[in-house]
UniProtKB/Swiss-Prot annotation:
Family, as annotated: Belongs to the IlvD/Edd family.
Chain residues that bind [2Fe-2S] cluster: C122, C195
Encoding gene per record: ilvD
Record-given protein name: Dihydroxy-acid dehydratase
Taxonomic lineage from the root: Bacteria, Pseudomonadati, Pseudomonadota, Gammaproteobacteria, Enterobacterales
Molecular-function annotations in GO: 2 iron, 2 sulfur cluster binding; dihydroxy-acid dehydratase activity; magnesium ion binding
GO biological process: one example: isoleucine biosynthetic process
Pfam families: ILV_EDD_C, ILVD_EDD_N
PROSITE patterns: ILVD_EDD_1, ILVD_EDD_2
Species annotation: Yersinia pseudotuberculosis serotype O:1b (strain IP 31758)
Oligomeric form and interacting partners: Homodimer.
Domain of life (superkingdom): Bacteria
Amino acid sequence: MPKYRSHTTTHGRNMAGARALWRATGMTDDDFGKPIIAVVNSFTQFVPGHVHLRDLGKLVAEQIVASGGVAKEFNTIAVDDGIAMGHGGMLYSLPSRELIADSVEYMVNAHCADAMVCISNCDKITPGMLMASLRLNIPVIFVSGGPMEAGKTKLSDKIIKLDLIDAMIQGANPNVSDEESAQIERSACPTCGSCSGMFTANSMNCLNEALGLALPGNGSLLATHADRKQLFLDAGKHIVALTKRYYEQDDVSALPRNIANKAAFENAMILDIAMGGSTNTVLHLLAAAQEGEIDFSMTDIDRLSRKVPHLCKVAPSTQKYHMEDVHRAGGVIGILGELDRAGLLNRDVSNVLGLNLTQTLEAYDVMLTQDEGVKQMYAAGPAGIRTTKAFSQDCRYPSLDTDREEGCIRTREHAYSQDGGLAVLYGNIAADGCIVKTAGVDKDSLTFRGPAKVFESQDEAVEAILGGKVVAGDVVVIRYEGPKGGPGMQEMLYPTTYLKSMGLGKSCALLTDGRFSGGTSGLSIGHVSPEAASGGLIGLVQDGDFINIDIPNRGIVLDVSEAELAARRETEEAHGDAAWSPKGRERQVSYALRAYAMLATSADKGAVRDKSKLGG
């Protein structure tokens, strides 16, 4: 029988000092011996997805205490990628993921906590906490802050749905008036919550449901809706039961590595492909798998991407549907139900409730369940009132979206495309692979050939795009923006956004060793591995070189002879210490970022630390 970790600090005369300090936090004699459960919050006033989390840890903690545990809350940092976008702040976004994972490990191990409830929401916070959970391998339940309501405004006598990306595109479009741009800006992000499309934050919160580490509804139930409160209460109650299953019943199936095993990781990736999730999810799943010592790689993602159809289309791939519409159609469980009926899921998986896949679908799939309470939960809708408060409204749709032929979620037979929403491409320029969000690519652009326009930084590319130096047919190549080369693997949302603003969104391609925001669409290919700073071929591309992109056949090739590439490599390596670094780029890089760069791996490994450099 495993021993409660917390007994290290609560039992024995030699721990009198530790107990004295525990007493100073409010613990009593009756508490020593109960499981100590960390409530890992991420409240901050910097991020709309986290601005409403201040009091939600208390909800979880009260339920933990009522269920027989001891709750101790602490906070992590949280970076808003949208606010950090387009300037030096974006260098810190991906490295913050490692910092969050480390800080959770530090707090939980330093104080010998027995289990965790992770209150996450936005882009790097959920992945960082997920990495920590699999690293620590103690009982955990995730409950996120929930999605933002979609923005809505009236333009040309028509009500349209909006999100952050619309504000960015229209703000850079010279054909949009200042008045219209301001109107869109004020309407795009109306409430607290993670941005309303299938961007990185919502993608990751959905994947946590598929991994089995979050409760049904977690990925899609709006932050503002009163029903979401129950998820926090249930997380507090169920984490105590989950913890006792492991420590008091020796049930190892309660541990995250046994819930989020390889089969669950495959299901999560299948879900991601089917819903056209953010390409960042590939990076984060690979990183989490490494922390959990799970054999899951780009090879698995490539294999899965070839057989999974695109069943759910959401902004930014369409403006018709946002997360509130996904929820109305049955949320994550609704998509999993269609995937299961298509015979695409691993069925031998479980979740933190102890339910297997069949039981979960019977209870929570709106196409199967007879539970009116579950149907009511999925009918939870937006109120359309600007607010930063959680659980502030209880509006409901008059009916669910169960149209699986033309609705938000579709059957395999009526899929948006028989090819999934993500694809892995290989070729000489990406020997270890690169990622494209096919859900956002125009059908006419699935094959593309064009001359390269090469830039050593995102900033240089943006200046050229807005300056009219990029024309239809070009392949914009942005390099030295990978985990090492950036450092920090910036998101290239501004270049893709400005290509759209300049009318080039469907006539140009963009290729980078950096990454993309979940809000990116168009022929945007990222995560090129190996990156330029690691000697990748992308570092040898020259202006005018032709690049062939073939998404249906999963290929990407720099059309330059092997002899010429060998000569270019020899010339580059002759630069010695200055080889494989950006030419003429001036960028202030702090020591914190330099430390990250020294240990960072390329994107095909999840951009995690190279453990071999640490003796691992």
